[in-house]
């Protein structure tokens, strides 16, 4: 921004944190100094941790997710394929601990931050799917046990 005294710079930092065992978070922050922006983003990313929690080497099913103009497709892959994705999406999936997955950006945006948020939404959708599937499986097991009695 330009003021009477001259240009006033602001820096925006996007930080991804993860333990490679199913927890990942994203933080975005602005500041007048790069180091301060990174520190703020790191704290925000720690607050926004999401438990992905997949026990297998890949994701359970194909998922499409959208955030603003960014749209992403995540597909499960066979063991040994590794992560087929580019840029920040690859970093996010690595830090989440997903070993074999294919990702394709379908949206028309080149904005890395919106692409990362679209990927986070996709991982949240998968977590909801997993929870729903486990709930249905538990109901079926309960019904089978009741039939045997």
Regions found by a protein language model. Give the residues of each.
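Ribosome-associated RNA-binding proteins
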Residues: 1-149
């Amino acid at each position: 921004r330009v003021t009477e005294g001259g240009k006033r710079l602001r820096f925006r930092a996007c930080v991804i944190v993860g333990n490679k065992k199913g927890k990942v978070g994203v933080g975005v922050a602005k500041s007048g100094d790069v180091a301060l922006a990174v520190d703020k983003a790191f704290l925000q990313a720690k607050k926004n941790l999401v438990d992905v929690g997949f026990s297998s080497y890949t994701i359970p099913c194909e998922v499409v997710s959208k955030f603003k103009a960014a749209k992403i497709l995540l597909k499960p892959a066979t063991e040994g394929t590794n992560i087929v994705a580019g840029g920040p999406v690859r970093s996010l999936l690595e830090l989440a601990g997903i070993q074999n997955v294919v990702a394709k950006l379908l949206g028309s945006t080149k904005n890395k931050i919106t692409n990362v948020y679209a990927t986070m939404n996709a991982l949240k959708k998968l977590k909801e799917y997993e929870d729903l599937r486990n709930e249905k499986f538990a109901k079926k097991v309960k019904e089978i046990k009741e039939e045997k009695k």
